[in-house]
């Protein structure tokens, strides 16, 4: 009887871990996961608006990447450095639609600011945590993100 309860409890734990909250946190095969989100680097180069539109077509809730911690920036910079042969990639912060009100394209709050305002769109460098404002019509690779 004791052995049956132990085995049953073990199976229950496995079942709950597979069917509970963790089950919905899987990213598609070619996406990388970090802190409840899925990320993917795209090598093709597009202007900011086309890259954002492309991201929204990849998965429900997907946008150009937004950053909310230094650790998240580090993760994406490492991922992009390994994948891209270019120095810059588009990120989701802009002030295209709101004049001087900078915001992330996914609607989340702008937690910190690490750039000089010169153009309306931002790129991040593939080898450090610097952000640069660039002409939105320039073409760069980009990273998409969605909540798992």
Curated annotation (Swiss-Prot):
Any GO MF annotation of the entry: toxin activity
Glycosylated residues (UniProt): 47, 137
Disulfide bonds: 27-38, 55-144, 121-136
Signal peptide: 1-23
Pfam families: Lectin_C
Compartments (UniProt record): Secreted
Assigned keywords, A-Z: Disulfide bond, Glycoprotein, Hemostasis impairing toxin, Platelet aggregation activating toxin, Secreted, Signal, Toxin
Domain C-type lectin: 34-145
Subunit-level organization: Tetramer of heterodimers of alpha and beta subunits (alphabeta)(4); disulfide-linked.
Main function: Snaclec that induces human platelet aggregation in the absence of any cofactor with the EC(50) of 0.25 nM and causes tyrosine phosphorylation in human platelets. Antibodies against either platelet GPIbalpha (GP1BA) or GPVI (GP6) inhibit alboaggregin D-induced platelet aggregation. Only the combination of these two antibodies completely inhibit aggregation, suggesting that it acts through both GPIbalpha (GP1BA) and GPVI (GP6).
Family note: Belongs to the snaclec family.
UniProt-recorded name of the protein: Snaclec alboaggregin-D subunit beta
UniProt source species: Trimeresurus albolabris
